[in-house]
Amino acid sequence: MIEKILKKIDEYECICLYRHVNPDYDAFGSQFGMYDLIQNTFENKEVYFAGDFSSDLVAKYQFTGEINEPNFEKPTLGIVLDTANQERIDGDISLCKEIIKIDHHIVVDSYGNLNLEDSTASSCSQIVALFLKNKRVKLSSFGAEALYMGIIGDTNRFMYSATDERTFEAAMYLYNYDFDMQALYERMYMKHVKDLKVNAFILNHYIEDEGVAYYVLKDEDLKYLNISRERGSDFVNLLSSVDEYKVWLAITENTKDHNWRVSMRSRHIPVNEIANKYRGGGHAFASGATLLSLDELPLLLNDIKERINE
């Protein structure tokens, strides 16, 4: 499959890189990593980005190139990274002549002409990194750093159960590139004084319900705390270390799309099937969902509690 993907990339002058909506470290990491791979391995390629790049995470990658959107005037190859199904792709892939899908989620939609899918991988960035290692294609320190950030983000610093020997193999390979590991971790995890205010707000307002802990940040709360909606979701693991809480959630108001984003985490209770029911998806113990209104929240909580009590 890897040889087929490299051959397909070589066939096209124009390539557009996609990833999922509401991007995380792995989405951006695999997207930037694939960009770097193509630019350093192939000649005369026009590489474009699809999707919203307004997230606070983008600056953490220190990308110095231009994020250009494609015009599709020439036949374009689309490469979709870290996205399980077509509905979650941030951008219109129908404008591409052919599609390559590279993903690590549970397989529900093999929408590519070529599909590199490994649901046992810790991250899409891990798949891309081992892709590089095994075929000795070229990468710069920027690309290696981006992929490493993707792995770190999706494994929560190698803490999640999907971490295995391949994860460390990929990390070791990337570590051989010249980037500042300490600076990388500081960009990803260093907090600011205002984050303490957010922590205090969440700890004073979160709700516990029969093994489920969650906090809700309305738009007025986000403005009061001076954080973005995406940043509001980042504090979900603040509730992760309490033994009595089997599942924990961050629920943030998305005024742009008139809905509520839910980040779902657990230690041992699978939540991805529940997330699928509420317009989302993801991994067994880390998923995302969307509520059309808070009226749906009791239904979601009941589904989670039923799963806990099975």
Give the ranges of each region predicted by the language model.
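Hydrophobic helix-and-loop "lid/oligomerization" segment in the mid-to-C-terminal part
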Residues: 2-22, 27-59, 69-77, 155-310
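Short, motif-level signal for alpha-helix interfacial/capping segments enriched in acidic residues
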Residues: 1-6, 81-82, 132-134
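Conserved beta-strand segments of alpha/beta enzyme cores
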Residues: 46-48, 98, 115, 138
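Short alpha-helices
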Residues: 105-170
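Short, hinge-like loop/turn segments at secondary-structure boundaries
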Residues: 64-68, 118-119, 266-267
